[in-house]
Each structure stands twice: as structure tokens, then as C-alpha cells.
């Protein structure tokens, strides 16, 4: 393992999936929202600015109200078969996280892909607006057909940052999205 090359640092959300030698496993997504969060530090920890996730239009489902928490798309996921964990998965990516995680789950559970192949599938989805398709992916070819059917389609970079681990005979196999920082490491 080596240091990351210099470049623009990602701000906001991080995710990791880890399994230890005993089989204890975690999928953890954490965020302080934007770089340095609220810019307020308490006892050495930066506080997040999660309140910016509220809809400030009165009466909306996610509008500000006393005792309410803002909607979050964080989706650290553990998949079980009976009592045994089969997979840990998650991603940064704001409101697109649910789309990213669902894509990888369908790839592994429904299509029989390994976790790396499922993570590498092109990204797509919606945030209650236009259909979003990953720019420069094989799904761009679908854009014209969707537009003909009345969809508004935007082709944009969608760099998920998915990280996952799946149980395989004799151990574990990891996957990390090559579109963003992250790596698989094991012994």
C-alpha cells in the first residue's frame, strides 16, 4: 500500500467496508457534508452541516420542523443469508448513493456478478428529476430511446466510490470503484 498521488481531495462523504480475520464485518458511511462541515469544532471533532439537507420550502416532506432529522441517502448495507453475513457494501455520493448501492446489489444478487464487476457497472439513476446516465459509459446509447419516450436525460460524470466485500468459498473478495479513490487490501 502506498500514499495517494497528489490531486484534488474529495470532500464530504466517505465509505469503507471491512472484514477482520474473525469474520467481524462493518459497512460504514460517514459524512460532515461539505469540506470542514459546519466549520465548528468541538473536542477535536468537526461538526457536520447536515441541516443543509432539509428542504426549506414549508410543507415539503423533508421540510424543517421541530424534533425532525433531515433525509439522508447514506446506505451502508450488510447482506445476510440466514445468520451469516454474505456481503458488505456502501458508497459516498450524496443523493445518488441509493442508486449506486442498488445497482451493485442487483449486479451481485440478481445477475450473479462478483462484487468488483457489479461495482464497475455504469451508473445511472434519478434524483426526482431527469434520468441521469454516466457520461462515457455504454448506457449512453440508451439516451436517444429514453428521450423518444419522453424522458429528460442528462449525461454526467457519476463517480460512485462504491466499496464492497463478499463472502466466497475459502474467504472474502473485495471490490472498489475505479472511478474514485479507494482500494482493496487483504491478506
Residue ranges and their predicted role:
Residues 6-156:
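Proteins synthesized as precursors that undergo proteolytic processing into mature forms
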Residues 10-11, 138-187:
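Cofactor-centric catalytic regions
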Residues 1-2:
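Amphipathic, membrane-active segments
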Amino acid at each position: 500500500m502506498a500514499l495517494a498521488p497528489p490531486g484534488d481531495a474529495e470532500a464530504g462523504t466517505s465509505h469503507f467496508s471491512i472484514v477482520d480475520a474473525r469474520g467481524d464485518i462493518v459497512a460504514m458511511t460517514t459524512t460532515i457534508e461539505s469540506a470542514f462541515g459546519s466549520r465548528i469544532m468541538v473536542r477535536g471533532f468537526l461538526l457536520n452541516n447536515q441541516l443543509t439537507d432539509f428542504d426549506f420550502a414549508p410543507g415539503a416532506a423533508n421540510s424543517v420542523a421541530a424534533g425532525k432529522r433531515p433525509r439522508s441517502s447514506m446506505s451502508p448495507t450488510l447482506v445476510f443469508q440466514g445468520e451469516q453475513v454474505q456481503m458488505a457494501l456502501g458508497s459516498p455520493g450524496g443523493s445518488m448513493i441509493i442508486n449506486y448501492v442498488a445497482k451493485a446489489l442487483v449486479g451481485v444478487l440478481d445477475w450473479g456478478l462478483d462484487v468488483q464487476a457489479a461495482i464497475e457497472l455504469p451508473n445511472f439513476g434519478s434524483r426526482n428529476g431527469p434520468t441521469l446516465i454516466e457520461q462515457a459509459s455504454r448506457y449512453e446509447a440508451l439516451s436517444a430511446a429514453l428521450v423518444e419516450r419522453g424522458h429528460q436525460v442528462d449525461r454526467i460524470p457519476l463517480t460512485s466510490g462504491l466499496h464492497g466485500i463478499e463472502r466466497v468459498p475459502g474467504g472474502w473478495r473485495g471490490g472498489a470503484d475505479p472511478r474514485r479513490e479507494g482500494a482493496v487490501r487483504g491478506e
